[in-house]
Amino acid sequence: MPHEELPSLQRPRYGSIVDDERLSAEEMDERRRQNIAYEYLCHLEEAKRWMEVCLVEELPPTTELEEGLRNGVYLAKLAKFFAPKMVSEKKIYDVEQTRYKKSGLHFRHTDNTVQWLRAMEAIGLPKIFYPETTDVYDRKNIPRMIYCIHALSLYLFKLGIAPQIQDLLGKVDFTEEEISNMRKELEKYGIQMPAFSKIGGILANELSVDEAALHAAVIAINEAIEKGVAKQTIITLRNPNAVLTCVDDSLSQEYQKELWEAKKKKEESAKLKNSCISEEERDAYEELLTQAEIQSNISTVNRMAAVDHINAVLQEGDPENTLLALKKPEAQLPAVYPFAAVMYQNELFNLQKQNTSNYLAHEELLIAVEMLSAVALLNQALESSDLVAVQNQLRSPTIGFNNLDEAHVDRYADALLSVKQEALSQGQDTLSWNEIQNCIDMINNQIQEENDRMVVLGYINEAIDAGNPLKTLDTLLLPTANIRDVDPDCAQHYQDVLFYTKSQKLGDPKNVSKVLWLDEIQQAINEANVDENRAKQWVTLVVDVNECLDRKQSDHILTALKSSPSNIHNILPECANKYYDTLVKAKESKTDNESSEGSWVTLNVQEKYNYYYNTDSKEGSWVPPELCLSKESWLTGEEIEDIVEEVTSDYIREKLWSASEDLLVRFEATTLGPALREEFEARKAFLYEQTESVVKIQAFWKGFKQRQEYLHRQQVFAGNVDSVVKIQSWFRMVTARKSYLSRLRYFEDHKNEIVKIQSLLRASKARDDYKALVGSENPPLTVIRKFVYLLDQSDLDFQEELEVARLREEVVTKIRANQQLEKDLNLMDIKIGLLVKNRITLEDVISHRKKLNKKKGGEIEILNNTDNKGIKSLSKERRKTLETYQQLFYLLQTKPSYLAKLIFQMPQNKSTKFMDTVIFTLYNYASNQREEYLLLKLFKTALEEEIKSKVDQVQDIVTGNPTVIKMVVSFNRGARGQNTLRQLLAPVVKEIIEDKALVINTNPVEVYKAWVNQLETQTGEASKLPYDVTTEQALTYPEVKNKLEASIENLRKVTDKVLGSIISSLDLLPYGLRYIAKVLKNSIREKFPDATEEELLKIVGNLLYYRYMNPAIVAPDGFDIIDMTAGGQINSNQRRNLGSVAKVLQHAASNKLFEGENEHLSSMNNYLSETYQEFRKYFQEACDVPEPEEKFNMDKYTDLVTVSKPVIYISIEEIINTHLLLLEHQDAIATEKSDLLNELLESLGEVPTVESFLGEGAVDPNDPNKENTLNQLSKTEISLSLTSKYDVKDGEAVDGRSLMIKTKKLIIDVTRNQPGSTLTEILETPATGQQELEHAKDMESRAVVDSRTPEEGKQSQAVIEDARLPLEQKKRKIQRNLRTLEQTGHVSSKNKYQDILNEIAKDIRNQRIHRKLRKAELSKLQQTLNALNKKAAFYEDQINYYDTYIKTCVDNLKRKNSRRSIKLDGKAEPKGTKRVKPVRYTAAKLHDKGVLLGIDDLQTNQFKNVMFDIIATEDMGIFDVRSKFLGVEMEKVQLNIQDLLQMQYEGVAVMKMFDKVKVNVNLLIYLLNKKFYGK
């Protein structure tokens, strides 16, 4: 890759042949080649940077660019850049390069290069520059392609489409290694380097007449520039043939200077490059400025002049002039907005002043104007109070705000609206960038404070609940809590008050919140502080008063009572003595128990809390002391208060009576009262008698006065009409404004409540609409319109679909790879076993090992068909064959009857292989819901067919081995159900295996033999017990019965655990297995109506437990239930434990009791019966599952509306075999001549060969291993995009359902843009121009989304054409379709076509379900892939383990001492340096020890003449035993300690040696251990 300004890197060394260094010819040639490589790397870097600018995308490093361009993706993207009408992104093959990264180049990558060449041809680039397709794809001449890119860049620059390519020669550095590598590459391909310097001249020679005139004009400009006369230069620039724009005569001097400098620079660069080239060979444009370069320099001068003008205008301070200057195209600045002219002026002027040079460069203006324009749009949105627009503007990347959190954009917008209103009220039109940023920072701080306070709120509530005062105090003192006036001394009281407050809140049912909020906590703290002050005041009063009484200071009592700010009011100085005397008397009455009193004064506050004060230490506390003895002799606060109030009230009462004594006397003496009352009553009686007259007089007088006032007021109004009108208008205005401002203040004061109410209303409305959509039988159109957007397919939908497709491919590929690897490993296991038994040679094993490693390492090369003659070649005939195969497999997928019949037409061995490979491959191993749905339909059809034709009795399902049941179990125990079995059984199985102390053996004879072996092994003496016993005899021994009972108890406990795991995990059971169990039960009931429920459930149990779970329990290592290391295995005890559990569960599932030979286990029969009841309920619930149509939300029309076509990955061999089988059994599976299957098979013709499938030339005909190569290539997988032969392609529906789907899409498009309460109203109302425009925009947006859709996910051409129709034409087409649908009975105009609206509502509901299911499928596929990867890793460990074993064998073969034993760690047993002495015994001695039991045809007294020599061999565990009779060697046998241990494990007590010597196996093992192993 290029590096800039690094001294350690290399640049080329140019020079003449005569140099000071006096180089040799070889050295000069070497330097020339190095310079060529460097120049070519520079051209690569130039092309890379130019393409990155055009594509706005990063390209591979320079040294990797050639390889990165071979797939043509970047070239096709470049073609899309300069010829977008010819090349679209959807036409670019492998646009994301996922296939290229995964499996390298594919022949279809050449399509990208062809599109690039055609695009260059379309814009008129001379073909002399074009490379060949093979130059790019096969890397035959990559420099030619780079040469073409340079020519294209210059051509596009002249057309004004692309920027000019840079000249980087001598400006970038490369390491010596990079230059050398490039030189070697160029030499390797023998490529002649193109003349990059002559591109300009060649383009000029290829120009038309008009372009020749352009060439002449450009030369004239260059000559004028050379002369240096500005006026002459401006004349040549004005020449129309030069096609130059924006030439300003006033800038002639600047043009001359800029162009002259550019020309001199180019001449110097040309001289440097062409020092060794003759002038005849040079290109004219190497020294002359091209038209594009001249235009570029003119634009540069214009831009500089425009920037100068902008800086000058900013100094003048006129916003309008500033706006005009910014708008000039020569300035090359972003768009500006007139309404923000003042802001541009002020902000840019301030920015100019901050600059040290008092000048803004173009780059600074570019950034500033772009940001200010974004701020202007934001201010505009704020003025219109458009929250959505404000939020969108805040998200704009050009505005560049810091710390903008997407989640809080709505709060920013609300805050900015408030700030904007305040600014407008103060006369400020726009908010500056800094003001907006400050507002954002303020909101961020508020949010942070709120979050912090919520956290600390939780801490405080937790501390309150914990009841720890110190912890509560710590949380209250946290700075983020912001709790005021917290006194550490009051910690206990704070805890008490807060706990009481929270308890009250919890007890109030009206309170929804069950925590204390910060305002409630602050209120409680304030209340506690008040309590503290009150308590201290009372303590001061009590102490002062009691001390005053103790000291008998009567003159100080008034001061003590007044100085304490307590609740005692109206303390009168006149009563001082009375206070003192009364208090003394009260205190004297309490001094009886003075000797036993303490020093504590207790004060009760609010009748809830106690405050404790120590009179000795003068300290108070809310915490109860350990020993609280009250000071009984002192008066309490309440007593003092009562006494003072009583004395004061007595005194006041006495004074009141004294003051009122004279008044009472006078009142009693007066006699005026009765006379006045008598006079008043007389007057009232008179008026009552004259009521009518009084009323008339009053009415007349009031009317007269009112008329006088009205007439006077009328005269005043008549004389001041204008004033009256003005006053009235002002009053109305003031009243309205007051009402408005009052309402506004009310809204401001209740903003939070208003927002909540609005949110609740919107939410309620949305809920009502959703309920109507979901729950209503006939949802109205107005509701449906609100939710139709949910039917849109987003980019995320397409990405998820692609990811699902990718994972499906990976899962299917990994399953097949693991299956093949497992077969090879099993074969390897067998071969190693045969090696151990000496049945095959080590060379055979090594040969298979090489094949295995070759597969594991992926060394088998899968050939790509690049000769355009294979099944996927671009020929019409091959394409038709491919499409027919795709239609054939689609038919087999969707019509299960064909495969169901085919399965039963084949022999058992062929059908099993067919099911394991072709069928599961055809359904992608049910890697998605569609395939799982279809596979279940096949299972159902095949199972019903098998039961109908092959099952004669109910028990045949249990006793036989039904093909479909075997297929279902095999599938659900495979990759799809493996995780289920692991989750279901792994924990309990692992627990059983890891329990080393667990021993379950329910065979009495085995228990007996193990007991006898144990006795003999421990004692070393022969047991007196018999070795061969029956079950009944074994059970007579108490030891055996005890061990058996212990085993049964252990068995019951362990079985409970396994049963519990199974019963509780019903939901984990695969749906497919449960559904087939349901089908099995219903099919059996249908064929055998007399079968009882018990019989049916036993059959279900046979499927679910015996066939599916039982083998996994017995052999968990074989079904990947537990993880096993390579070479690891389950020992015999563990396997027996698992087998015992499985046996009990099997009996329980079939409700079979222990009888007959298992009579000794009859104690478990009650347990079996109870367990069966649990199983019975489990089997019933297992069958309670919905139909696949409901479960997967699918039907036969689902494929018509899915985003992507179904794809399967199948090998060539499987395609050929399937084709062959279909032809072989065609008459049986497609009986009707008009059957579609017959039509497809007829189209395909004969079964093709592998070679014809791959295409001619795929295999060398002279290859001696042609057959092996073809066999290997037949396993090559290809992808088939399945399609129906009768897909709708011509725009006409084949049935009412398809027409319904098309009509629904059209209705959805129309209802988006045209309002109306019913469909009929919309269709009858003409669309406005605005609605047509909005509809066109929507369709354009959809077309953009569709353009990014992968080919396999694109909709049919008919649907696309319908989408392009104008609104009115769509409505007419809807009306036609609705009439057709009404004739077929699908809709009715009587209910205003509500049926089709109901279908749309159903689609909306199902879309959410589909997305949810797709996410679940993604997760499920990922889990399956992870499990498969783990399994593959285990197989690789197994391969490595076998490698170690075989390598050890090879190493040992190379040694001369082949007799030494082989171990898996590669180490041989050390060869002894001394000969081992034999152990010698007479037969009589061995007989005495109990080892030897007898010798055939020899008396016991002759045993002393028989001698046995036992010799340890060099092989570990192997012993030679020689026998001698009377000193003569008779025979020799070899003992293997492993064989003896196996016999002991199997319970064999006696064995024969030399065919006549009977020995005790247990005692022989004991003897060998003692003599040779010291144990």
From Swiss-Prot:
Gene that encodes the chain: Iqgap2
Residues with Phosphothreonine modification: T356, T782, T881, T1002, T1269
Residues covered by the Calponin-homology (CH) domain: 41-156
Keyword Nucleotidyltransferase on entry: no
Chain ranges of the IQ domain: 690-719, 720-749, 750-779
PROSITE patterns membership: CH, IQ, RAS_GTPASE_ACTIV_1, RAS_GTPASE_ACTIV_2, WW_DOMAIN_1, WW_DOMAIN_2
Residue ranges of every copy of the Ras-GAP domain listed in the record: 933-1182
SMART domains registered for this protein in UniProt: CH, IQ, RasGAP
Keywords in alphabetical order: Calmodulin-binding, Phosphoprotein, Repeat
Domain WW: from-to ranges: 594-627
GO cellular component, one term: cytoplasm
PANTHER family tied to this protein: RAS GTPASE-ACTIVATING PROTEIN WITH IQ MOTIF, RAS GTPASE-ACTIVATING-LIKE PROTEIN IQGAP2
Protein's recorded name: Ras GTPase-activating-like protein IQGAP2
